[in-house]
Amino acid sequence: MEYSRRSLTILTLILVAALAPAPAFGSAIIGRNVTGATLSIDRQGRAHVSYRSGGRERSVVAWGAINARAPSTHTAQVKFRLRYGLRGGGVCLPYDGPPLAWLLKACKAQDGSYWALQSWVRLKPNYGGTRGAMELHLSHWRGALPALSLYQNWAYGKYRHFFGRLTYRGRGVYGFTATGHGAPLDSYGRNIYVDTFNSRYGKGWHRENSFLTHHRGHTLGDFCYGFFPHFGHPSGQGTKYRATAEGPGVTPVVMWAADDIGAYDATVQQQMQSLERSWGDPKCRA
Protein backbone atom coordinates (compact mmCIF):
# COMPACT_ATOMS: atom_id res chain seq x y z
CA MET A 1 0.00 0.00 0.00
CA GLU A 2 1.20 3.52 -0.76
CA TYR A 3 -0.80 5.17 2.02
CA SER A 4 1.16 7.14 4.60
CA ARG A 5 -0.06 6.97 8.20
CA ARG A 6 -0.85 10.69 8.12
CA SER A 7 -2.87 10.39 4.91
CA LEU A 8 -4.73 7.41 6.37
CA THR A 9 -5.70 9.47 9.43
CA ILE A 10 -6.93 12.30 7.21
CA LEU A 11 -8.80 9.84 5.01
CA THR A 12 -10.49 8.30 8.04
CA LEU A 13 -11.58 11.71 9.30
CA ILE A 14 -13.12 12.43 5.92
CA LEU A 15 -14.89 9.10 5.61
CA VAL A 16 -16.30 8.51 9.10
CA ALA A 17 -20.08 8.90 8.97
CA ALA A 18 -21.84 11.04 11.53
CA LEU A 19 -23.65 9.10 14.24
CA ALA A 20 -26.50 11.60 14.46
CA PRO A 21 -29.45 10.60 12.28
CA ALA A 22 -29.09 12.03 8.80
CA PRO A 23 -31.86 12.66 6.27
CA ALA A 24 -33.20 9.38 4.91
CA PHE A 25 -32.99 9.50 1.14
CA GLY A 26 -33.12 5.77 0.38
CA SER A 27 -35.68 3.13 1.17
CA ALA A 28 -37.99 5.12 3.44
CA ILE A 29 -37.46 4.85 7.19
CA ILE A 30 -41.04 4.27 8.31
CA GLY A 31 -40.37 3.96 12.04
CA ARG A 32 -37.88 2.96 14.72
CA ASN A 33 -37.92 0.19 17.31
CA VAL A 34 -41.23 -1.12 16.03
CA THR A 35 -43.01 -4.42 16.64
CA GLY A 36 -45.74 -6.29 14.81
CA ALA A 37 -45.11 -4.69 11.40
CA THR A 38 -47.48 -5.70 8.59
CA LEU A 39 -47.48 -4.89 4.87
CA SER A 40 -50.19 -5.03 2.21
CA ILE A 41 -50.77 -3.48 -1.21
CA ASP A 42 -54.10 -1.99 -2.29
CA ARG A 43 -55.69 -1.92 -5.76
CA GLN A 44 -54.16 1.49 -6.45
CA GLY A 45 -50.68 0.09 -5.94
CA ARG A 46 -50.13 1.83 -2.60
CA ALA A 47 -48.37 0.14 0.32
CA HIS A 48 -50.13 0.01 3.69
CA VAL A 49 -47.85 -0.49 6.68
CA SER A 50 -49.02 -0.88 10.26
CA TYR A 51 -46.89 -1.41 13.36
CA ARG A 52 -46.62 -0.69 17.06
CA SER A 53 -44.14 1.88 18.38
CA GLY A 54 -43.90 3.83 21.62
CA GLY A 55 -46.86 1.96 23.04
CA ARG A 56 -49.16 3.01 20.19
CA GLU A 57 -50.59 1.43 17.06
CA ARG A 58 -49.40 3.36 14.00
CA SER A 59 -50.03 3.22 10.27
CA VAL A 60 -48.70 4.79 7.09
CA VAL A 61 -49.55 4.64 3.40
CA ALA A 62 -46.74 4.99 0.81
CA TRP A 63 -46.92 5.58 -2.94
CA GLY A 64 -45.40 7.55 -5.80
CA ALA A 65 -41.94 6.01 -6.24
CA ILE A 66 -40.25 2.90 -7.58
CA ASN A 67 -36.63 1.91 -8.28
CA ALA A 68 -34.08 4.76 -8.58
CA ARG A 69 -32.66 7.41 -10.87
CA ALA A 70 -29.02 7.52 -11.90
CA PRO A 71 -27.00 10.18 -9.99
CA SER A 72 -27.73 13.71 -11.20
CA THR A 73 -26.92 17.22 -10.04
CA HIS A 74 -30.09 18.53 -11.71
CA THR A 75 -32.86 16.11 -10.71
CA ALA A 76 -33.64 14.84 -7.22
CA GLN A 77 -33.77 11.14 -6.51
CA VAL A 78 -37.17 9.43 -6.38
CA LYS A 79 -38.90 9.28 -2.99
CA PHE A 80 -42.17 8.06 -1.52
CA ARG A 81 -45.14 10.16 -0.67
CA LEU A 82 -46.07 9.16 2.88
CA ARG A 83 -49.26 9.74 4.78
CA TYR A 84 -49.19 8.72 8.42
CA GLY A 85 -52.34 7.84 10.31
CA LEU A 86 -54.22 6.75 7.20
CA ARG A 87 -55.63 3.28 7.67
CA GLY A 88 -56.59 0.93 4.92
CA GLY A 89 -55.66 -2.44 3.60
CA GLY A 90 -54.97 -4.62 0.65
CA VAL A 91 -53.38 -7.95 -0.12
CA CYS A 92 -49.87 -9.35 0.01
CA LEU A 93 -49.32 -11.70 -2.89
CA PRO A 94 -46.61 -14.35 -2.30
CA TYR A 95 -43.12 -12.95 -2.74
CA ASP A 96 -41.11 -14.67 -5.48
CA GLY A 97 -38.31 -12.14 -5.87
CA PRO A 98 -34.61 -12.33 -4.97
CA PRO A 99 -33.44 -12.97 -1.38
CA LEU A 100 -33.29 -9.86 0.79
CA ALA A 101 -31.13 -8.98 3.79
CA TRP A 102 -32.72 -7.95 7.08
CA LEU A 103 -36.15 -8.96 5.76
CA LEU A 104 -39.34 -8.67 7.82
CA LYS A 105 -42.01 -8.89 5.12
CA ALA A 106 -42.12 -8.79 1.32
CA CYS A 107 -45.07 -8.74 -1.05
CA LYS A 108 -45.63 -8.97 -4.76
CA ALA A 109 -48.03 -6.35 -6.08
CA GLN A 110 -50.67 -7.00 -8.72
CA ASP A 111 -48.59 -5.11 -11.31
CA GLY A 112 -45.64 -7.47 -10.74
CA SER A 113 -43.50 -5.05 -8.73
CA TYR A 114 -42.26 -5.81 -5.22
CA TRP A 115 -42.55 -4.10 -1.85
CA ALA A 116 -40.51 -5.02 1.22
CA LEU A 117 -40.03 -4.14 4.88
CA GLN A 118 -36.50 -4.54 6.21
CA SER A 119 -35.35 -3.88 9.77
CA TRP A 120 -31.75 -3.21 10.86
CA VAL A 121 -29.60 -1.05 13.11
CA ARG A 122 -28.01 1.45 10.73
CA LEU A 123 -26.46 3.88 13.19
CA LYS A 124 -24.09 2.54 15.86
CA PRO A 125 -21.00 4.09 17.47
CA ASN A 126 -17.93 3.44 15.33
CA TYR A 127 -15.07 1.25 16.60
CA GLY A 128 -17.01 -1.28 18.63
CA GLY A 129 -20.61 -0.11 18.90
CA THR A 130 -23.38 -2.70 19.21
CA ARG A 131 -26.51 -0.71 20.00
CA GLY A 132 -28.72 1.70 18.13
CA ALA A 133 -32.28 2.24 16.97
CA MET A 134 -33.77 -0.59 14.93
CA GLU A 135 -35.02 1.16 11.78
CA LEU A 136 -37.95 -0.08 9.69
CA HIS A 137 -37.25 0.50 5.97
CA LEU A 138 -39.80 0.30 3.14
CA SER A 139 -38.75 -0.28 -0.48
CA HIS A 140 -40.47 -0.66 -3.88
CA TRP A 141 -38.85 -1.99 -7.04
CA ARG A 142 -39.01 -4.18 -10.08
CA GLY A 143 -36.10 -5.87 -11.82
CA ALA A 144 -32.59 -6.29 -10.47
CA LEU A 145 -31.51 -5.28 -6.97
CA PRO A 146 -28.59 -2.96 -6.24
CA ALA A 147 -25.27 -4.82 -6.00
CA LEU A 148 -22.76 -4.39 -3.19
CA SER A 149 -19.41 -5.99 -4.07
CA LEU A 150 -16.45 -6.02 -1.74
CA TYR A 151 -12.88 -7.34 -1.92
CA GLN A 152 -10.33 -8.05 0.80
CA ASN A 153 -6.56 -7.77 0.77
CA TRP A 154 -3.78 -6.50 3.05
CA ALA A 155 -2.20 -3.17 3.96
CA TYR A 156 1.45 -3.23 5.07
CA GLY A 157 1.22 -7.01 4.87
CA LYS A 158 -0.75 -7.34 8.11
CA TYR A 159 -3.78 -5.03 8.34
CA ARG A 160 -6.99 -5.96 6.61
CA HIS A 161 -7.98 -3.71 3.71
CA PHE A 162 -11.37 -3.52 1.99
CA PHE A 163 -12.39 -1.98 -1.31
CA GLY A 164 -15.55 -2.35 -3.34
CA ARG A 165 -18.45 -0.78 -5.22
CA LEU A 166 -22.14 -0.11 -4.79
CA THR A 167 -23.89 -0.27 -8.17
CA TYR A 168 -27.40 -0.27 -9.60
CA ARG A 169 -28.12 -1.53 -13.09
CA GLY A 170 -24.40 -1.48 -13.81
CA ARG A 171 -23.81 2.13 -12.74
CA GLY A 172 -22.12 3.40 -9.60
CA VAL A 173 -24.22 4.71 -6.71
CA TYR A 174 -22.83 7.95 -5.26
CA GLY A 175 -23.72 11.47 -4.23
CA PHE A 176 -22.25 14.91 -4.75
CA THR A 177 -22.30 16.67 -1.37
CA ALA A 178 -21.77 15.53 2.21
CA THR A 179 -20.85 16.82 5.65
CA GLY A 180 -17.27 16.74 6.87
CA HIS A 181 -18.17 13.59 8.80
CA GLY A 182 -19.44 11.78 5.70
CA ALA A 183 -23.21 12.16 6.06
CA PRO A 184 -24.83 12.66 2.61
CA LEU A 185 -26.40 16.06 1.98
CA ASP A 186 -28.16 15.14 -1.26
CA SER A 187 -30.62 12.43 -2.23
CA TYR A 188 -28.00 10.32 -4.04
CA GLY A 189 -25.21 9.80 -1.52
CA ARG A 190 -24.87 6.46 0.25
CA ASN A 191 -22.85 5.17 3.16
CA ILE A 192 -21.41 1.68 3.58
CA TYR A 193 -21.84 0.35 7.15
CA VAL A 194 -19.23 -2.26 8.12
CA ASP A 195 -19.53 -4.68 11.06
CA THR A 196 -16.86 -7.08 12.32
CA PHE A 197 -17.34 -10.39 14.17
CA ASN A 198 -15.31 -11.68 17.14
CA SER A 199 -12.73 -8.91 16.93
CA ARG A 200 -10.76 -7.18 19.68
CA TYR A 201 -13.92 -5.20 20.38
CA GLY A 202 -15.45 -8.36 21.85
CA LYS A 203 -17.49 -11.40 20.92
CA GLY A 204 -20.24 -11.14 18.33
CA TRP A 205 -20.94 -8.34 15.86
CA HIS A 206 -19.56 -4.84 16.44
CA ARG A 207 -19.59 -1.76 14.22
CA GLU A 208 -16.22 -1.01 12.68
CA ASN A 209 -16.99 2.12 10.67
CA SER A 210 -19.18 3.70 8.02
CA PHE A 211 -18.11 5.72 4.99
CA LEU A 212 -19.31 7.26 1.74
CA THR A 213 -19.11 5.81 -1.73
CA HIS A 214 -16.94 7.96 -4.02
CA HIS A 215 -17.55 9.94 -7.20
CA ARG A 216 -13.92 10.30 -8.31
CA GLY A 217 -11.96 8.30 -10.86
CA HIS A 218 -13.54 6.39 -13.71
CA THR A 219 -15.12 3.65 -11.57
CA LEU A 220 -17.82 5.55 -9.69
CA GLY A 221 -19.58 4.37 -6.55
CA ASP A 222 -16.44 2.74 -5.15
CA PHE A 223 -14.96 2.89 -1.65
CA CYS A 224 -11.96 1.66 0.36
CA TYR A 225 -11.13 1.18 4.02
CA GLY A 226 -8.21 -0.03 6.14
CA PHE A 227 -8.61 -1.85 9.46
CA PHE A 228 -5.88 0.15 11.16
CA PRO A 229 -5.92 1.18 14.83
CA HIS A 230 -7.97 4.39 14.85
CA PHE A 231 -7.88 7.15 17.48
CA GLY A 232 -6.78 4.87 20.32
CA HIS A 233 -9.02 1.99 19.28
CA PRO A 234 -7.53 -1.38 18.29
CA SER A 235 -7.70 -2.80 14.80
CA GLY A 236 -11.18 -4.16 14.19
CA GLN A 237 -10.02 -7.22 12.27
CA GLY A 238 -12.41 -10.10 12.96
CA THR A 239 -13.15 -13.63 11.84
CA LYS A 240 -15.84 -12.45 9.44
CA TYR A 241 -17.43 -9.23 8.21
CA ARG A 242 -20.64 -7.79 6.84
CA ALA A 243 -21.28 -4.55 4.98
CA THR A 244 -24.74 -3.04 4.55
CA ALA A 245 -25.95 -0.16 2.38
CA GLU A 246 -29.25 1.48 1.56
CA GLY A 247 -29.98 1.05 -2.12
CA PRO A 248 -30.44 4.14 -4.31
CA GLY A 249 -33.86 5.72 -4.57
CA VAL A 250 -36.43 3.45 -2.96
CA THR A 251 -34.67 0.17 -3.73
CA PRO A 252 -33.98 -2.30 -0.89
CA VAL A 253 -31.19 -2.40 1.65
CA VAL A 254 -28.41 -4.73 0.44
CA MET A 255 -25.71 -6.60 2.33
CA TRP A 256 -22.38 -8.34 1.66
CA ALA A 257 -20.89 -10.88 4.08
CA ALA A 258 -17.76 -13.07 4.08
CA ASP A 259 -15.16 -14.73 6.29
CA ASP A 260 -11.84 -13.00 6.89
CA ILE A 261 -9.38 -13.55 4.06
CA GLY A 262 -6.74 -15.04 6.38
CA ALA A 263 -2.95 -15.05 6.15
CA TYR A 264 -1.09 -12.88 3.66
CA ASP A 265 -0.89 -14.26 0.13
CA ALA A 266 1.42 -12.41 -2.27
CA THR A 267 -0.39 -13.63 -5.39
CA VAL A 268 -3.81 -12.59 -4.14
CA GLN A 269 -2.39 -9.26 -2.98
CA GLN A 270 -1.00 -8.51 -6.43
CA GLN A 271 -4.33 -9.38 -8.07
CA MET A 272 -6.33 -7.21 -5.68
CA GLN A 273 -3.94 -4.26 -5.96
CA SER A 274 -4.16 -4.40 -9.75
CA LEU A 275 -7.94 -4.40 -9.60
CA GLU A 276 -8.13 -1.48 -7.18
CA ARG A 277 -5.63 0.57 -9.17
CA SER A 278 -7.59 -0.04 -12.36
CA TRP A 279 -10.53 1.86 -10.89
CA GLY A 280 -8.57 5.11 -10.93
CA ASP A 281 -9.88 6.50 -7.64
CA PRO A 282 -7.35 8.97 -6.17
CA LYS A 283 -8.71 8.21 -2.68
CA CYS A 284 -7.96 4.51 -3.08
CA ARG A 285 -4.43 4.26 -4.40
CA ALA A 286 -3.28 0.76 -3.55
Where are these regions (language model features)?
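Bacterial N-terminal signal peptides
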Residues: 9-20
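Bacterial N-terminal signal peptides that target proteins for export
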Residues: 1-10
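Extracellular, repeat-based ectodomains that mediate carbohydrate processing or recognition
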Residues: 25-286
